[in-house]
Structure formats: structure tokens, C-alpha cells
From Swiss-Prot:
Transmembrane segments: none annotated. Molecular chaperone; binds unfolded polypeptides in vitro, and has a weak ATPase activity. Forms an oligomeric complex of eight-membered rings. One of its GO terms (biological process) is protein folding. Keywords: ATP-binding, Chaperone, Nucleotide-binding. This is Thermosome subunit. Belongs to the TCP-1 chaperonin family. It holds the Pfam family Cpn60_TCP1. InterPro entries: Chaperone_TCP-1, Chaperonin_TCP-1_CS, Cpn60/GroEL/TCP-1, GroEL-like_apical_dom_sf, GROEL-like_equatorial_sf, TCP-1-like_intermed_sf, TCP-1_chaperonin, thermosome_alpha. GO terms for molecular function: ATP binding; ATP hydrolysis activity; ATP-dependent protein folding chaperone; unfolded protein binding. It comes from the Archaea.
Length: 542
């Protein structure tokens, strides 16, 4: 029998424990702080963030996922919310800020319900019901978009690019993105592999200089200046083997006593390299991309044959070259045949921003393309590349799913209206959670108004009134005019998948945090490289 009053120590002294409401409040606070961090970046008039790392490197962006990735975050609940943004980026390529802001608002509404003594399980059930209903309603709100509807696809890309630092050239960028995505669509499945669109970044020119190359651009130069700079009607060999004499695996030693033998040895080495080059030339190849090294002597012989050669090409670039030119990657020079060669109308070395780059262009049916992103400075071109990447993601979603919804907060207001109506049919305290979910969705139009310097209350009232009318589900906030307008007419549209993924991710993250009622945190080991006092996760750290 245990002694009365004697304390039983289960956890070590350096472990902190937060139980029940304390744990929930702490997690909710951490999640809300992450959401507040990116909230001001939402929409076309959202502000940018400047992030400076330990080395003094600067990133200027308003891309939600980039901000969250670059931030050093300690709190485990905050890290879970950052995962929401990463999932959104990976799945659909855009809507990261929307997902995180909705998650933060769901947590804020959940805290209000917890203060009314509503059990977390009830809130979770209500949120799950609301999420399922929202996704169902989204499908009924969505409009169809056909793959051949270029104008609509351009509008989708422009909506994504707006507010991302590349606005002045958004029409041109949208056109480039739509062309690029269309070029790599799999004709059988209708799917798009984003990896087949290479975004090459070079500063030193205005954003308007951004171009689509129907082929591949390699950030390399010719291995020998004697080689031709430009090859028309190129026959391209892709080699995954070095053009040099292979060293043996064994540590063999050759003792030469006669100087003539040494000359024979060197001549034999030369002959082996010359034979390799002869074999390549015999196939009719006049351009060689090699994943490994090219011997100095091999470079000389290739130049004499008028063959343009590039070495140490990345594996990903080799795969894109194969897709663009129709070439096959060969792992042994002896196996190279004319059938393995790819074709391109032009292969040329050009100077871009002072650096030599190899352009492989005029491919007949390229299944890999390159967007050469330009900007006046390194920070501008990085932001342009991020905008292009997001636009590729949304156009890909629209082509694959074929459904779009109105932007500018129109969809969120409509969902909130329908969820409030649905809440009336829900019995029990879950009804309050469904209503809270509906209110949380309105954070998107409210934030769009705030970030544009408009009165959020006035705008919400106008939006709700517009949505009560027949066909009002497409009315959203035009932040440039400060008016409530038809978003489809205005061309502010987003793929359905971006919205469903944002609502799914936000709900799952908030539900996961609400389920936690006990946090047991070990203190960091002293002398840890990030500082020894980081174990405390109390509210004072945030």
C-alpha cells in the first residue's frame, strides 16, 4: 500500500507539461500567430515580408509558403500549421495563405466555443460536418472550364500572379504559363507533370523579357571554345557516361623501362579517346550532352569534328532534354546508334546576363519546355519565378479537374451563407460549431478588404446582400475599385481544387490541434546549436 501524501515523480524535473485547457490555449495561440503572420499578404493588395536569415541573406516575398518555410519556428503546434501550407503548395501550387488564414480563424472560433464550455469533441464533430457540407456545396457552385478555353485559363493564371510582384507583366506571364502547361499535357491521361516545365532564373533585364522556350535551356557552356556556337538541324546524343579513359578498379601498376613503350602507352590512350569520338560522330550526332566528364583530348577531337559538347549536365536536365528532343539517354558509347539521337531545329550558346547558356530550341513536339524568368535584380527574379510556379500549379489543376470557382471572397461568402442555413438542421451543440465554421470562412473577404484599405464591415454587408440575390454566388470584392462585382465577368477565378484543398487542410490542422489536451515537452539540451533555452513553450515565448 502506497504511503499517504508521498509524492510520486513520474516525469524528469526538466520536462514541462501543459494539461487540458492550458495545452489547448497554448496550441491555439501558436496557430493563430502563424496565421496572423501571413494574413497581411493575402490578396492583390497584400503586403510583402522581408526575411533575413543567419547569414544575412534576404528574401522579399508575399508567397505564404515561402514566408513560413523561411521562418525559424520552435513551437510544435506552429510547425503543424506550416505543414498545412506545404501540403497546399505540393498538392495544388497556390492558396497557401488562404489555407493558413482559414486554419487560424477556425482555431480562434474554437477558442470562443471552448470558453462557452463546449467540449472539444463536439467542436471537432461540428467542424467535420461543416467541412463535408462545404466541399459538397463547392461542387455545386463550380463552373466548368474546357481545356481549349485559352482565355479562361489565362484568367486563372492572372488571378494567381496578381499581387505577387510581377503584376505589370501578368498578362504576358499568364500567356506563357498557359502555353507551357498545354505543351506538356499527357495526351492520353490529360495529366500535367510540373517537372517537365523548367523555370530558369536570370536577373539583369525587366520582367517583360521573360520568354517561353519550346525546348530546354541549360545553364552551362561549351566545353571548348573551338566548338561551334550554333548548330542548326541538330542531331543530339545524350550520354550518361564519361568521354575519357576509364581507370581500372584494381590498383594495377605498370613498370615501363623503355621510353618507346611510354610513347606507345600514351598513343594507345589517345587512340581509345579518338575511337570514342569517332563512334559518336559515326552516328551523325553534331551535339553531345554528357552527364559525366569529357577529357581535354576528347574535347579537341569533338571540336575538330564540329560537334558542340556540354559536360556535367544535371540528371533532371538530361531527362527534360530526352522529352523535348525525343533522344534516348545512353549509358555506353558503344551502344549509341542513330536511332538514339534526338532532334532540334537549333542548339545555340548565348550570353544571358553575362553568363553563357545553351538553348535547345525549335523541337518538333517538345514534351518539356523552359520558361526563362527575368527580373531587374535577384530578389525580383526570385519572386517572378515563384509567381510563375504558382500559376503553373493552378492552370494544371484547372486542366486536370475542369472546374473553377469565383475568386475575390465570393466563394467563401456563398459557402458561409449555405453553411448557416445547414446549421439550422443540425441538432445539438454541433450547430454552434457549424455556425462558427461559417463565420471563420468570412475571414477571407474580410482580410481582402482590410489589406486593401477598405472598411471590412461595409464590404461584408454589401457582399452578403449581393449573395441573397438570384445568381449572386459569383459576386466578390474588387479590391481595385472597392466595389462588389461579378467575379467571373471580371476574370477573377480559381480552380475548384485550390478551394477544396484549402478547406480540407485548414480543417484537418485545426481539428488535430483541438484533439491535443496534454503537451509534454522536454527541455533542450544545454549547448544546443540553436541555443539551450528553447524548451519552454509557454505563452511568454510568443
Amino acid at each position: 500500500m502506497a504511503m499517504a501524501g508521498a509524492p510520486i515523480v513520474v516525469l524528469p524535473q526538466n520536462v514541462k507539461r501543459y494539461v487540458g485547457r492550458d495545452a489547448q490555449r497554448m496550441n491555439i495561440l501558436a496557430g493563430r500567430i502563424i496565421a496572423e503572420t501571413v494574413r497581411t499578404t493575402l490578396g492583390p493588395k497584400g503586403m510583402d515580408k522581408m526575411l533575413v536569415d543567419e547569414l544575412g541573406d534576404i528574401v522579399v516575398t508575399n508567397d505564404g509558403v515561402t514566408i513560413l518555410k523561411e521562418m525559424s519556428v520552435e513551437h510544435p503546434a506552429a510547425k503543424m500549421l506550416i505543414e498545412v501550407a506545404k501540403t497546399q503548395e505540393k498538392e495544388v501550387g497556390d492558396g497557401t495563405t488562404t489555407a493558413v488564414v482559414i486554419a487560424g480563424e477556425l482555431l480562434r472560433k474554437a477558442e470562443e466555443l471552448l470558453d462557452q464550455n463546449i467540449h472539444p469533441s463536439v467542436i471537432i464533430n461540428g467542424y467535420e460536418m461543416a467541412r463535408n457540407k462545404a466541399v459538397e456545396e463547392l461542387k455545386s457552385i463550380a463552373k466548368e472550364v474546357k481545356p481549349e478555353d485559352t482565355e479562361m485559363l489565362k484568367k486563372i493564371a492572372m488571378t494567381s500572379i496578381t499581387g505577387k510582384g510581377a503584376e505589370k507583366a501578368r498578362e504576358q506571364l499568364a500567356e506563357i504559363v498557359v502555353e507551357a502547361v498545354r505543351a506538356v499535357v499527357d495526351e492520353e491521361t490529360g495529366k500535367v507533370d510540373k517537372d517537365l516545365i523548367k523555370v530558369e532564373k536570370k536577373e539583369g533585364a525587366p520582367i517583360e523579357e521573360t520568354k517561353l522556350i519550346r525546348g530546354v535551356v541549360i545553364d552551362k557552356e561549351r566545353v571548348n571554345p573551338q566548338m561551334p556556337k550554333k548548330v542548326e538541324n541538330a542531331k543530339i546524343a545524350l550520354l550518361n557516361c564519361p568521354i575519357e579513359v576509364k581507370e581500372t578498379e584494381t590498383d594495377a601498376e605498370i613498370r615501363i623501362t623503355d621510353p618507346a613503350k611510354l610513347m606507345e602507352f600514351i598513343e594507345q590512350e589517345e587512340k581509345m579517346i579518338k575511337d570514342m569520338v569517332e563512334k559518336i560522330a559515326a552516328t551523325g550526332a553534331n551535339v553531345v550532352f554528357c552527364q559525366k566528364g569529357i577529357d581535354d583530348l576528347a574535347q579537341h577531337y569533338l571540336a575538330k569534328k564540329g560537334i558542340l559538347a556540354v559536360r556535367r549536365v544535371k540528371k533532371s536536365d538530361m531527362e527534360k532534354l530526352a522529352k523535348a528532343t525525343g533522344a534516348r539517354i545512353v549509358t555506353k558509347i558503344d551502344d549509341l546508334t542513330p536511332e538514339d539521337l534526338g532532334e532540334a531545329g537549333l542548339v545555340e550558346e548565348r550570353k544571358v546576363a553575362g553568363d553563357a547558356m545553351i538553348f535547345v530550341e525549335q523541337c518538333k513536339h517538345p514534351k518539356a519546355v523552359t520558361i526563362l524568368a527575368r527580373g531587374s535584380t535577384e530578389h525580383v527574379v526570385e519572386e517572378v519565378a515563384r509567381a510563375i510556379d504558382d500559376a503553373i500549379g493552378v492552370v494544371k489543376c484547372a486542366l486536370e479537374e475542369g472546374k473553377i470557382v469565383a475568386g475575390g471572397g465570393a466563394t467563401e461568402i456563398e459557402l458561409a451563407k449555405r453553411l448557416r442555413k445547414f446549421a439550422e438542421s443540425v441538432a445539438g451543440r454541433e450547430q454552434l460549431a457549424v455556425k462558427a465554421f461559417a463565420d471563420a470562412l468570412e475571414v477571407i473577404p474580410r482580410t481582402l478588404a482590410e489589406n486593401s484599405g477598405l472598411d471590412p464591415i461595409d464590404m461584408l454587408v454589401k457582399l452578403r446582400a449581393a449573395h441573397e440575390k438570384e445568381g449572386g454566388e459569383v459576386y466578390g470584392l474588387d479590391v481595385f475599385e472597392g466595389e462588389v462585382v461579378d467575379m467571373l465577368e471580371k476574370g477573377v477565378v480559381e480552380p475548384l481544387k485550390v478551394k477544396t484543398q484549402a478547406i480540407d487542410s485548414a480543417t484537418e490542422a485545426s481539428v488535430m490541434l483541438l484533439r491535443i489536451d496534454d503537451v509534454i515537452a522536454a527541455e533542450k539540451v544545454k549547448g544546443d546549436e540553436k541555443g539551450g533555452e528553447g524548451g519552454d513553450m509557454g505563452g511568454d515565448e510568443f
